[in-house]
């Protein structure tokens, strides 16, 4: 597989950066479809999931009648439905009618519920929200379930769906000094929206759904794990993609370190050191050194933890006048800092579970590095997404702290930053408690997935969470209800050079409804017309896909399960205690 042309990369990156804080919201609403391809070798196909004995159910009342439904028992006084009308959406080229219900759950949780007028298969899916949320994704747009070209349950309007803005409007956290809005964003908004959707379903169809699912990516992945931890009976199956479960760490130390590493002055007053063109130079060198681990020349790194690439290996010779194909000493230092992450100055202990991994460099553009080339320098680090998400989340993370730190005063080299600034809101905002015993007991199924080339959230945090689950509950118990998939070359909630089209909806429905646990899941690359150009299986962690050695390596049929390439547990780091069991905190109006 050839590398993407640099012009295409930079154009794509500019488009990503243009959406700034809204980027993650877009990613999260795409999750359910990003989980809809066709089944592959050793996997459960979409058609298998469709064989579940669930009859199509038709409405028993007119859509307009739902406008009169009282939802104050769920959201409290002031909760109201504002409209209930039949709308038409284009799904897979066909027109599909939905009873679209809009409303507000007090004090300010705006929601939309989409109920298929025909073809409902007794399934419900709540859709996660990304970034700092603040907008309601249109749940009638089944095409927003990206990559659903072979998932008939989604394409044919088989799911009732719901989405919420989680209690506020806008992508910053200016609202976050309000304790109730903190709670609505942290955990309450999705839960009460689900209860409302279920009430509407029961009224509209004359019966409850048979199966309920939650699908989210990024913050939507955090919301997914929050549901499993706090409301274990809400969903039969949960898909948590690239979860920002460590919300506070992610939006302070993690992204803040990217800014500090990039700055010519070491703080937010400086300009960027590493630019888009040099990120591509770095990426080419990394994949040349570490790509092809699966036995084919595809430029993908099957497990970046085995890649010991040193940026100094491509440092420009002293006195070089043309540095377009090498890194300057300053650029080498910046890249090394981004990979290495911060450490405690006294103990040498790492401050983070992980950083952006080798092979993710192309995806740094617009996040860790500017969208422009080094010839367009200087660009202030305040233009980076990493800076914007950190400063946008100040109020949400540090309200109630002894002082309000800034991106320049975070304890990047002082482990006491965790108990001093992040511990207080940890049980409220984070979703890192590894004890999912109640969810397991309720029969729930969980699929975690993460792209190895994620530019926003290091996959090592997700590995840390999965390992914590195994250490807390026992590996055999975890295997009974949870799987984790790590996808080489795939960026944050999709994209990248890898195989981003992955069918997880059929996997979770088959597991929850038929008891068929997922194993190999086929992933796909497609062209601009959405035609499949290559396929490859991905296996439950820690196994990797390995080319069989015969046939076309672009065909997933010629791949098998390989042994893990890396067998060490996640290193101890300053925030490791955040991944031990704790009692979730609540505040404000209690959720039903």
Show the residue positions of the predicted features.
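Cap/lid segment of the alpha/beta-hydrolase catalytic domain
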Residues: 130-206, 252-253, 260, 404-428, ...
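C-terminal motif of bacterial Sec signal peptides marking the signal peptidase cleavage site
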Residues: 32-35
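N-terminal secretory signal peptides that target proteins for export/translocation
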Residues: 1-18
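Alpha/beta-hydrolase fold nucleophile elbow
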Residues: 207-218
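Catalytic-loop region of hydrolases
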Residues: 41-123, 127, 135-141, 147-149, ...
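Glycine-rich nucleophile elbow surrounding the catalytic serine of serine-hydrolase chemistry
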Residues: 216-226
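Short beta-strand/loop motif that positions the catalytic acidic residue
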Residues: 448-450
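A catalytic-pocket lid/entrance helix-loop region that shapes and gates access to the active site
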Residues: 226-228, 233-343, 486, 503-506
């Amino acid at each position: 597989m050839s590398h993407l042309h640099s012009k295409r990369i930079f154009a794509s990156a500019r488009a990503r950066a243009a959406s700034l804080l809204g980027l993650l919201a877009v990613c999260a609403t795409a999750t359910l479809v990003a989980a809809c391809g066709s089944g592959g070798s050793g996997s459960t196909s979409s058609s298998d999931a469709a064989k579940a004995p669930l009859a199509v159910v038709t409405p028993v009342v007119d859509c307009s009648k739902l406008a009169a439904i009282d939802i104050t028992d769920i959201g409290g006084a002031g909760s109201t439905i504002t409209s209930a009308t039949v709308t038409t959406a284009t799904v897979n080229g066909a027109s599909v009618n939905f009873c679209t219900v809009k409303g507000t759950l007090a004090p300010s949780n705006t929601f939309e519920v989409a109920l298929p007028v025909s073809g409902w298969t007794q399934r419900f899916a709540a859709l996660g929200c990304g970034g700092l949320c603040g907008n309601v994704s249109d749940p009638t747009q089944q095409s927003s379930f990206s990559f659903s070209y072979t998932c008939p349950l989604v394409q044919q309007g088989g799911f009732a769906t719901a989405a919420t803005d989680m209690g506020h409007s806008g992508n910053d956290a200016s609202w976050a000094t309000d304790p109730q809005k903190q709670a609505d964003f942290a955990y309450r908004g999705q839960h009460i929206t689900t209860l409302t959707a279920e009430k509407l379903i029961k009224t509209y169809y004359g019966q409850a759904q048979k199966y309920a699912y939650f699908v989210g990516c990024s913050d939507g992945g955090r919301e997914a794990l929050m549901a499993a931890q706090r409301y274990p009976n809400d969903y039969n199956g949960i898909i948590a993609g690239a979860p920002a479960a460590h919300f506070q760490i992610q939006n302070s130390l993690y992204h803040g370190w990217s800014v500090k590493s990039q700055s010519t002055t070491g703080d937010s007053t400086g300009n960027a050191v590493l630019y888009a063109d040099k990120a591509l130079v770095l990426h080419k060198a990394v994949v040349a050194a570490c790509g092809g681990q699966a036995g084919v020349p595809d430029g993908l790194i099957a497990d970046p933890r085995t890649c010991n690439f040193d940026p100094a290996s491509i440092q420009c010779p002293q006195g070089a006048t043309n540095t377009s194909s090498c890194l300057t000493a300053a650029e080498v230092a910046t890249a090394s800092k981004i990979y290495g992450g911060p450490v405690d100055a006294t103990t040498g202990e790492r401050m983070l579970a992980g950083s952006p991994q080798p092979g993710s460099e192309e995806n740094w553009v617009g996040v860790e590095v500017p969208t422009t080339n080094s010839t367009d320098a200087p660009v202030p680090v305040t233009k980076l997404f990493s800076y914007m998400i950190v400063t946008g989340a100040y109020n949400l993370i540090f309200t109630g702290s002894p002082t309000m730190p800034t991106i320049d005063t975070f304890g990047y080299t002082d482990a006491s930053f965790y108990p001093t600034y992040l511990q207080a809101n940890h049980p409220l905002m984070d979703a890192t408690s590894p004890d999912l015993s109640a969810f397991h007991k309720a029969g729930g199924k969980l699929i975690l997935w993460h792209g190895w080339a994620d530019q926003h959230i290091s996959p090592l945090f997700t590995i840390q969470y999965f390992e914590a689950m195994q250490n807390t509950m026992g590996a055999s118990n975890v295997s009974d209800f949870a799987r984790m998939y790590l996808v080489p070359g795939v960026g944050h909630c999709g994209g990248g050079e890898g195989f981003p089209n992955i069918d997880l909806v059929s996997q979770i429905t088959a597991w929850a409804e038929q008891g068929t646990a997922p194993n190999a899941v086929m992933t796909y690359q497609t062209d601009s017309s959405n035609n499949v150009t290559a396929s490859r299986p991905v296996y439950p962690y820690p196994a990797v896909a390995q080319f069989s050695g015969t046939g076309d390596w672009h065909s997933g049929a010629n791949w098998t399960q390989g042994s893990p390439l890396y067998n060490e547990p996640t290193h101890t780091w300053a925030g490791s205690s955040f991944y031990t069991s704790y009692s979730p905190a609540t505040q404000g109006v209690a959720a039903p």
